[in-house]
Amino acid sequence: MQWNVPKTVFRLAHRTCMEPHKAGLLGHCQNMKGPLLLYTLESRVVVVQGPQKRWLHLPTAQCVAKERKPFTAVQSQPGVFHHKQWEQDILSKRVLSSSATSSGPPSEKKEDPDPLQDRSISLYQRFKKTFRQYGKVLIPVHLITSAVWFGTFYYAAMKGVNVVPFLELIGLPDSIVNILKNSQSGNALTAYALFKIATPARYTVTLGGTSFTVKYLRSRGYMSTPPPVKEYLQDKMEETKELLTEKMEETKDRLTEKLQETKGKVSLKKKVE
């Protein structure tokens, strides 16, 4: 009986002293804004994350988090956690954008036919594309054929061929016809006028001569036969994909190195503190 009396008094005193502290702690946790960490520790120091960090020395601390987002443990390096998550988001966005860029099928691109064989475009466009692709062959052929055309017209003018009725017949403007009628330059101007009028025929002859010359040079082995356009596009897409993969690996390595450096700096600061 004597033993029970001090024990009962001790329990009453313990409840009287400790219950207000627990109630105050729970009320303080509810009034704090921001995420709170859940812990149940015995006689340890607990850090409560709120607008301000508070160190609490409690025999038993139980706080209820306002947000339902799970926290695995006390974040020993909160700065590193957010930095790592930010870098991972950037890396994933870069990977998705590069893969979306390189995932386009090469078959969707329109295949450009050989301009020497393409009859669906105008004569001038064919001449322009042929000049871009076979310029080294087209220029000599065009110069030779142009010289032949001009020489032929000049010879005809020397022989007294009157082109004025022909120009009037084809509907040439009167201003040009009058210049040829009253011109004192003679055969050269007449030959030049015929040379300009025959431009469509000259382009057609130039394209035909270029096609014949290209075939001849390829048969002799002086020009390489171009691969099919589809295979060419596939090869280009493979090269682009390899380059993008290498750049992605380099970017990933750099981000990993920066992350390791940041971890080292944060851990060093923690040790100093």
Swiss-Prot record:
Primary localization class, coarse: membrane
**Could you name the Gene Ontology cellular component terms for this entry?**
cytoplasm; membrane; mitochondrion
Superkingdom of the organism of origin? Eukaryota
Chain positions covered by the region annotation Disordered: 97-116, 247-273
Q: Which keywords belong to this entry?
A: Coiled coil, Cytoplasm, Membrane, Mitochondrion, Transmembrane, Transmembrane helix
Compartments, as annotated in UniProt: Membrane; Mitochondrion; Cytoplasm
Q: How does it sit in the membrane?
A: Single-pass membrane protein
Transmembrane ranges, per UniProt, are: 137-157
Ranges annotated as biased composition (Basic and acidic residues): 107-116
Q: Which Pfam families is this protein grouped with?
A: FAM210A-B_dom
DUF1279 domain sequence ranges: 118-230
Q: What positions belong to coiled-coil segments?
A: 230-269
Which stretches does UniProt call biased (Low complexity)? 97-106
This chain's function reads: May play a role in the structure and strength of both muscle and bone.
Q: Which PANTHER family match?
A: PROTEIN FAM210A, PROTEIN FAM210B, MITOCHONDRIAL
What quaternary arrangement does the UniProt entry report?
Interacts with ATAD3A.
Homology family: Belongs to the FAM210 family.
Q: Give the protein name, as stated in the record.
A: Protein FAM210A
Organism, as annotated: Bos taurus
